[in-house]
UniProtKB/Swiss-Prot annotation:
The keyword tRNA-binding applies. The gene is rpsG. Keywords: Ribonucleoprotein, Ribosomal protein, RNA-binding, rRNA-binding, tRNA-binding. The keyword NAD does not apply. This is Small ribosomal subunit protein uS7.
């Protein structure tokens, strides 16, 4: 284990929208260090969203999608006297954002559209409209926390 907590490294805002969340999203989307490919996919998805419905901005849809997918509660396993309990805990803001990004990318990759740009654009649109697999994942996480509310007193 490390002696000290690692300092949080600051991410630079992306060059087009000046948004740090987009930079984090691109970094999570990246495979094998190919950031230019991930950047093309991300900006392509935002353009595709704007093309589908001209009256909304792609960046607003992206922000709505992130907000709708952020989990408030999650369950953590806690072992007490030989039994393992699923204890509901609140999610820290940084983890909320990280989970939202991870779920959006994971479920976008699992979609059946042809290109990753289309997959990501449609997943972001669904999430912004409170639909889609990533939103369902958030709902399932919340239901698990609600179901195990009785074990909330085992918090750390």
């Amino acid at each position: 284990m490390r002696r000290r907590k690692a300092p949080v490294r600051e991410v630079l805002p992306d060059p087009i929208y000046g948004n740090k969340i987009i930079t984090k999203f691109i970094n999570s989307l990246m495979y094998d260090g190919k950031k230019s490919v991930a950047t093309e996919i991300m900006y392509g998805a935002i353009k595709a969203i704007e093309k589908k419905n001209a009256e909304v901005k792609g960046i607003d849809v992206f922000n709505d999608a992130i907000e709708n997918v952020k989990p408030i509660l999650e369950v953590k396993s806690r072992r007490v006297g030989g039994a393992t309990y699923q204890v509901p805990v609140e999610v820290r803001p940084a983890r909320q954002q990280a989970l939202a990004i991870r779920w959006l990318i994971t479920f976008a990759r699992k979609r059946s559209e042809r290109t990753m740009v289309d997959k990501l654009a449609n997943e972001l649109l669904d999430a912004a409209n409170s639909k889609g697999a990533s939103f369902k994942k958030k709902e399932d996480t919340y239901k698990m926390a609600e179901a195990n509310k009785a074990f909330a007193h085992y918090r750390w």
